[in-house]
Amino acid sequence: NRYISTIMKVTPYRPINKAIFAPIASWTEEKPYDGPSFGTNLERNNTTKIFNKHLEKACIENDLIFISIFDDMLNEDGSTNPIYLDDFGTGIHLSQKSMPLIIKKLKANKLI
């Protein structure tokens, strides 16, 4: 609830559409991350899926735009397709190959 309440406190100086960009799918063994992390790729993705469902519900209740490419980033088995993750060492950020997914969602929500 603090996540949404913080967004609701933002008072822009001009009218804007507030949007939440949901967390993305987790790093994969194909692009390993050496920072702190818990569980397998599937466990992390399942947790993110649950969080995103709660976040989407809260966005709807508060008239916020919810944008997610999470499901689009997954393989059929629920693992992350590494093509959407960066190639510059961390594997936890989006790559340029994710841009068409993002642009499609932004257009669908009339943000661009």
Q: Could you describe each region identified by the protein language model?
A:
Residues 11-18:
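A short helix->loop->beta-strand "cap" motif at the edges of active sites that frequently abuts
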Residues 20-23:
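Structural beta-sheet core signal
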Residues 27-112:
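Catalytic His-Asp segment of secreted/periplasmic serine-dependent ester chemistry enzymes
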